[in-house]
């Protein structure tokens, strides 16, 4: 009978409707209630009849029939016997589908421990009983007895006894004087005997008493698990199993293969092993076998059950016939191939096809070419239904035949079906949401899918053999979403940065660039044209050239929309470009009246989108694409050998550099400079040489040449390609026609000898060999990068997946301050770019007049940002995802503008996932390597500060001394020079290096480009603050100082050596002191002695007895040694920041403001303490390894947050010392830094969303009168709720500090255990969730995908909203009805009993 008809008669039970899912430990009673019968035999199916054995693992009596509505012996067949149990074979006649749902069980002859609660660390059983895992295993695996009741004997409670000790104790005290047991029974008794309430009171009391930190932590852990058992309704003894559930047979199938063999699921083997051992144990017990045999059997049973639940967690892995480990129940869930990730989160879909893509330049932006053959297959059901509706076929079979024969009417119907039915195109890897877009299919001949050229950058596709997949949205809702949300015309802007992503590239750019070139001196220059037709005529008759400078009268629009005409100096090409520009007052002809490079074109598209809207933009893009292709073809730009111009000055520059390098070599041989310095200088010289040659080559290539008639000649083709942004970069041109330059070794160091040849001249054998290192490393890196970047994206998505816009405004007053990011004097990210599309967190006032420019709560558009710039506002407080106060999700105001649409963000937008994709997608472009900074990278070491603005100098924390050479020297580390304009607005601030020579003073006027200060970038000085005579302390020749004589100059150089490693030098403390005329040590202004400690490798600049003035250099520390440190860059750096790892050589940060004091050294560490200014705080102490250079002196004053030892700060320290805002600013800037280096633009808000997710937890510092445990980490939301409740009841509230978690850790600690379990460490997450009886409220995206519902984002969010409203209304209506019913029913009088007729 047909399946559909059966389903009519058998309406399936409606799917359960649920709002949340709870997980807990199953009690034996629960397992029995699930079970349909006990499995007694290990047999599976009979190998001859293929029928399941009775009471075996596939028993039909327990699990249900094998065929629909047919018992095993065949007595009852068909539907009419539904529900009957056959008396012969005892099988219920029903659907065979029940074999996927019905469970069985195995009654164990002896209890066994559940391995997850035993071995999944921390061991839950161990924590509850306060026993070590080792002891537990000894008891469980029958090595030791445990005393349960010591009675009146000298034994202790829970004491372990070996076999001998046990027998001896029995002899000594008598058999019944104490109780001791062994195995899982013993543990079960112990767990049963726990009184959780008493235990909890006892633990809390103990925690109050203890002072030891470690003990407190241990007690807190126990307390937590005791509470978990108390409140979750789980009983501790359930962790020991007496019944094992057996999963339904169709979930562990056994399939006969041809040749009489069977393919089976590993679970069957594991179950068989359990049943065999269990049956053997039962038999041995009946036979009253010796204890030792029974014990061995019990141990084997425990091992069999362990292997079934989690093979390999304890002891040897149990393997199958072919030495392959068997897949246990836990393995079914874990990892990429497990249930969660393979089947629940990612499924394969039908109605899909894939093919190679080719370019479709004649398509419109919303179209794609779909091969007819493919369309016919994909839309088959639709075609069948249309054929049926038109009466061309009566049955599906007939329709099938028609389609197979490809009759003409089938093609007509296909056209009908496809019309306005969008399809989804996807290119793997789908790194961000633009990797799947919807298009309207256009039927084409051939077998390749045609793709519109402008969407290639979104898909990251090219036509060198890429394949794409097509999916058909079936339901009406799906088609609607595809059209309204996913259509390629709706994805013009990039969600990561809000810039257009539908941007012309390559040939289109080249064509448009060629079209917009203006060349002087061509025939017809200066002619006047009134309209386009005249220009076209002139072009055809060769009166003018495309590039001739002409005057053109162009019609535009004014603000009211009235036409205005204006004369422009332009070219014929640009006039043609002006034809496709939409008419709008904000998009005048000037927009395109310039040389169009890729960047310019992108700007024009952005402008058109902002002012003219989406429809106009799409039409404009299609038009300029056509124009670009056409002109690229007309231009006929090609590229010959002579277009690569080798600069004439090349060999002279090379020769000069060679001489210089020889000089450095000579200096090294003479001992004037160290090897490191020589290496740095040589590499420096070659970098400069490469740069110079490259600059000369660019000037020669881009030079404007004249043709014989005096006009400008055609521009160099290669220069056009590179300059327009179509293909190639200056760097590649340098390698073609300049010199290849320096190469790196595989280790990342730079090879001293550069490659002098370029590709045009050809490389020598040695040069070629040197260049293979880098190339090979590049390929290896790329392979690793892809995997790493993918993993980063996965972690980001997982941590942010439940971040959704759930409300318009949370009403918070908080926000973060934004200012332009300035690096070494250049603006890297302007204030305008950072605040565009964000909400103002306060009224923004113009500093000079105090008038409000932007009101609080305004979403800042381009116009507002311009106004702020004109008002000269330097710092803006904006709302941010970090400070949003919503309980679930983020509010629209704190998020700001939806970057992909340019409008305020919608409800239900999954901003977390968008943020994760925006950060993860460019991951593959980041580098993988850690840089060894040396030579080439050192050129960008700055040695001066220039002013970027005209203005007046203001110096904060001023401390300047005049030294012996009468130069002004900066004497403190926190001196800041600000440049102030006429209104008193700070235009720029610069932090001055310690020891820098100042070129300006307070109140000086500076011009733009004037130097403010300069310093030696290669050394760090130690300066004196007082004048006097030099004295040495503990500077002993050969112990703490070594003198080297430079032969060529005869100068002695004294360097401090590591005094701890020399004999008798352990207690030395080398220093320079400044003495007065009386021979006493001078005092500093702030009270300490003028004694300057020296660190290893310091080079002395003074002698004993010489006179110094304040500001003179006593010693200098070469930073060259500090400079070859590894700098983690690229992907590893991003991962390090998001994982909140402590960096190697972390900086030490002052936790309080105060005075530095050096204490007694401890082993090989320096002891530094800070005496607080605020007398109520306590002194903080730091131990610092002696090799590290501490640039502070005794008595220096530090601010909170100052670095005591330089380095990368650990994010946790920043959070603890400076707070959330500083931490966020640090993380955002550091991450942006990495992306900026690669030229990737990402909006700050994406990083803020991720950082918000990393700051979800609070660590309890004081529990107050709540049930929380101090030291535990708890969700912010939960923390606030508990505190609010305590406040209501008038109790003392708890206090906590925010904790920063890395993204992996944060994902594992989300409120949803489903989401965490499907991410990583499945076993641990599920064990913990079960012990706590956790409830998953199904709020995030992941959990909803897993249980197969609409996700609560996008259209799913609106659906759930509607559902909520409906439920509320239903409740109201029902309540009303009940009220009315209660009101209507009158109180009836007592009814008389009915008189029943008495039976005869």
From Swiss-Prot:
Its cofactor is Mg(2+); Zn(2+). It catalyses: RNA(n) + a ribonucleoside 5'-triphosphate = RNA(n+1) + diphosphate. Its EC number is 2.7.7.6. Pfam families: RNA_pol_Rpb1_1, RNA_pol_Rpb1_2, RNA_pol_Rpb1_3, RNA_pol_Rpb1_4, RNA_pol_Rpb1_5. Zn(2+) 2 binds at residues 810, 884, 891, 894. Binds 1 Mg(2+) ion per subunit. Binds 2 Zn(2+) ions per subunit. It is an enzyme of class 2 (transferase). Zn(2+) 1 binds at residues 71, 73, 86, 89. This is DNA-directed RNA polymerase subunit beta'. It comes from Rhodopseudomonas palustris (strain BisA53). The lineage of its organism: Bacteria, Pseudomonadati, Pseudomonadota, Alphaproteobacteria, Hyphomicrobiales.
């Amino acid at each position: 009978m047909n399946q559909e008809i059966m389903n009519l008669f058998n309406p399936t039970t409606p799917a359960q409707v649920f709002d949340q899912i709870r997980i807990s430990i199953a009690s034996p009673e629960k397992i029995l209630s699930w079970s349909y019968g006990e499995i007694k035999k290990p047999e599976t199916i009979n190998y001859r009849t293929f029928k399941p054995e009775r009471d075996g693992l596939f028993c039909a009596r327990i699990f249900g029939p094998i065929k629909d509505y047919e018992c095993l012996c065949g007595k009852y067949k068909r539907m009419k016997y539904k529900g009957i149990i056959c008396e012969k074979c005892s099988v219920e006649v029903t659907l065979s589908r029940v074999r996927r749902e019905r469970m069985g069980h195995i009654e164990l002859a002896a209890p066994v421990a559940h391995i997850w609660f035993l071995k999944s660390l921390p061991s839950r059983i161990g924590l509850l009983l306060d026993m070590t895992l080792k002891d537990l295993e000894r008891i469980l695996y029958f090595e030791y007895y445990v005393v349960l009741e010591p009675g009146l004997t000298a034994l202790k409670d829970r004491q372990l006894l070996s076999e001998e000790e046990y027998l001896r104790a029995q002899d000594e005290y008598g058999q019944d004087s104490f109780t001791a047991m062994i195995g899982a029974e013993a543990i079960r008794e112990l767990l049963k005997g726990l009184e959780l309430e008493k235990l909890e009171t006892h633990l809390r009391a103990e925690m109050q008493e203890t002072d030891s930190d470690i003990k407190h932590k241990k007690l807190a852990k126990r307390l937590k698990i005791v509470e978990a058992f108390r409140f979750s309704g789980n009983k501790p003894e359930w962790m020991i199993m007496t019944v094992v559930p057996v999963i339904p047979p169709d979930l562990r199938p056994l399939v006969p293969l041809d040749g009489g063999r069977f393919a089976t699921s590993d679970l069957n083997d594991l179950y068989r092993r359990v049943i065999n051992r269990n049956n053997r144990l039962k038999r041995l017990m009946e036979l009253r076998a010796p204890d030792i045999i029974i014990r061995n059997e019990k141990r084997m049973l425990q091992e069999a059950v362990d292997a079934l639940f989690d093979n390999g967690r304890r002891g040897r892995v149990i393997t199958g016939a072919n030495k392959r480990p068997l897949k246990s129940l836990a393995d079914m869930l874990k990892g990429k191939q497990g249930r969660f990730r393979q089947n629940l989160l990612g499924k394969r879909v039908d109605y899909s096809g894939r093919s190679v893509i080719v370019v479709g330049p004649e398509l419109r932006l919303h179209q794609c070419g779909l091969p007819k053959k493919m369309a016919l297959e994909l839309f088959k059901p639709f075609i069948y239904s249309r054929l049926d509706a038109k009466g061309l076929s009566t049955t599906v079979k007939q329709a099938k035949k028609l389609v197979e024969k490809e009759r003409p009417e089938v093609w007509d119907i296909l056209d009908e079906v496809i019309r306005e039915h969008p399809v989804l195109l996807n290119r793997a890897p789908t790194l961000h949401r633009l990797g799947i877009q919807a298009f309207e299919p256009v039927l084409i001949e051939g077998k390749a899918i045609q793709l519109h050229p402008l969407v290639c950058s979104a898909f990251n596709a090219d036509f060198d053999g890429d394949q794409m997949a097509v999916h058909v949205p079936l339901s009406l809702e799906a088609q609607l979403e595809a059209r309204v949300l996913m259509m390629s015309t709706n994805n013009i802007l990039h969600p990561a940065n809000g810039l257009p992503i539908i941007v012309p590239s390559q040939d289109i750019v080249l064509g448009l660039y060629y079209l917009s070139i203006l060349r002087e001196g061509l025939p017809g220059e200066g002619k006047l044209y009134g309209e386009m037709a005249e220009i076209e005529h002139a072009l055809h008759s060769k009166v003018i050239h495309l590039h001739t400078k002409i005057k053109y009268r162009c019609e535009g629009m004014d603000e009211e929309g009235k036409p205005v005409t204006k004369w422009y100096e332009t070219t014929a090409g640009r006039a043609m470009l002006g034809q496709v520009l939409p008419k709008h007052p904000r998009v005048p002809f000037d927009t395109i009246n310039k040389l169009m490079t890729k960047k310019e074109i992108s700007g024009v598209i952005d402008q058109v989108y902002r002012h003219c809207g989406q429809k106009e933009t799409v039409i404009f893009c299609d038009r300029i694409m056509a124009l670009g292709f056409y002109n690229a073809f007309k231009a006929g730009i090609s590229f010959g050998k002579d277009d690569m111009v080798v600069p004439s000055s090349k060999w002279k520059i090379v020769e000069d550099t060679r001489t210089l390098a020889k000089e450095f070599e000579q200096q090294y041989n003479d001992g004037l400079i160290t090897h490191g310095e020589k290496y740095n200088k040589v590499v420096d010289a070659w970098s400069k040489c490469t740069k110079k040659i490259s600059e000369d080559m660019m000037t020669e290539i881009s030079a404007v040449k004249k043709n014989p008639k005096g006009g400008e000649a055609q521009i160099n083709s290669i220069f056009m390609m590179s300059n327009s942004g179509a293909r190639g970069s200056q760097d590649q041109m340098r390698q073609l026609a300049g010199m290849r330059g320096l190469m790196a070794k595989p280790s990342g160091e730079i090879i001293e000898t550069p490659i002098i040849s370029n590709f045009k001249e050809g490389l020598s054998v040695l040069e070629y060999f040197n260049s293979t290192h880098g190339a090979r490393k590049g390929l290896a890196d790329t392979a690793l990068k892809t995997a790493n970047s993918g993993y980063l994206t996965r972690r980001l998505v997982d941590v942010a997946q439940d971040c959704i816009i759930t409300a318009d405004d949370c009403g918070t007053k908080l926000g973060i301050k934004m200012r332009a990011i300035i690096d070494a004097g250049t603006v890297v990210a302007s204030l305008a770019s950072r605040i565009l599309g964000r909400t103002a967190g306060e009224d923004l006032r113009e500093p000079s007049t105090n008038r409000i420019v932007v009101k609080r709560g305004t979403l800042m558009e381009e116009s507002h940002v311009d106004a702020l710039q004109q008002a000269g506002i330097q710092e803006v407080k904006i709302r941010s995802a970090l400070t949003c106060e919503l309980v679930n999700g983020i509010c629209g105001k704190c998020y700001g503008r939806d970057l992909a649409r340019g409008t305020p963000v919608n409800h239900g937008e999954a901003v977390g996932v968008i943020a994760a994709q925006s950060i993860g997608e460019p991951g593959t472009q980041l580098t993988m390597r850690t840089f060894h900074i040396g030579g080439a990278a050192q050129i960008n070491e700055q040695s001066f500060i220039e002013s970027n603005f005209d203005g007046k100098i203001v110096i904060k924390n001023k401390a300047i001394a005049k030294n012996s050479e009468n130069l002004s020297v900066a004497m403190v580390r926190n001196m800041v020079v600000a440049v102030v304009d006429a209104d008193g607005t700070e235009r720029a601030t610069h932090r001055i290096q310690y020891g820098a020579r100042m070129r300006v003073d307070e109140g000086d006027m500076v011009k733009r480009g004037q130097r403010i200060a300069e310093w030696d970038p290669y050394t760090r000085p130690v300066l004196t603050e007082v004048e006097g005579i030099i004295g040495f302390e503990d500077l002993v020749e050969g112990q703490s100082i070594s003198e080297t004589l430079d032969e060529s100059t005869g100068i002695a150089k004294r360097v401090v050596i590591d005094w701890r490693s020399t004999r008798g030098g352990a207690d030395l403390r080398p220093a320079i002191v400044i003495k007065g005329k009386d021979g006493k040590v001078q005092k500093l202004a702030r009270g300490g002695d003028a004694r300057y400690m020296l660190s290893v490798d310091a080079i002395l600049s003074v002698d004993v007895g010489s006179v110094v003035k304040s500001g003179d250099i006593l010693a200098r520390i070469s930073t060259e040694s500090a400079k070859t440190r590894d700098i983690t860059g690229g992907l590893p750096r991003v991962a390090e920041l998001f994982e909140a790892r402590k960096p190697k050589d972390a900086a030490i940060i002052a936790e309080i403001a105060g005075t530095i004091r050096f204490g007694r050294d401890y082993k090989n560490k320096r002891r530094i303490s800070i005496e607080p200014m605020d007398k109520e705080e306590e002194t903080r102490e730091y131990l610092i390894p002696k090799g590290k250079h501490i640039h502070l002196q005794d008595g220096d004053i530090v601010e909170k947050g100052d670095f005591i030892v330089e380095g990368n700060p650990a994010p946790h320290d920043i959070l603890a010392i400076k707070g959330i805002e500083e931490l966020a600013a640090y993380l955002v800037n550091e991450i942006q830094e990495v992306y900026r280096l690669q030229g990737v633009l990402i909006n700050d808000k994406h990083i803020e969303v991720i950082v918000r997710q990393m700051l979800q937890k609070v660590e309890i510092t004081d529990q107050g009168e709540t049930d929380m445990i101090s030291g535990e980490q708890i969700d912010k939301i939960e923390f606030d709720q508990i505190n609010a409740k305590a406040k209501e009841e008038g109790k003392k509230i708890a206090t906590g500090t925010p904790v920063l978690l890395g993204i992996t850790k944060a994902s594992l600690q989300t409120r949803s255990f489903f989401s965490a379990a499907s991410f990583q460490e499945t076993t641990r997450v599920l064990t913990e969730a079960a012990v706590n009886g956790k409830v998953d409220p199904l709020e995030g995206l992941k959990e909803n995908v897993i249980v197969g519902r609409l996700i609560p984002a996008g259209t799913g969010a609106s659906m759930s909203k509607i559902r909520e409203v409906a439920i509320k209304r239903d409740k109201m209506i029902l309540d009303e009805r009940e009220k009315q019913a209660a009101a209507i029913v009158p109180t009836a009088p007592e009814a008389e009993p009915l008189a029943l007729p008495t039976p005869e």
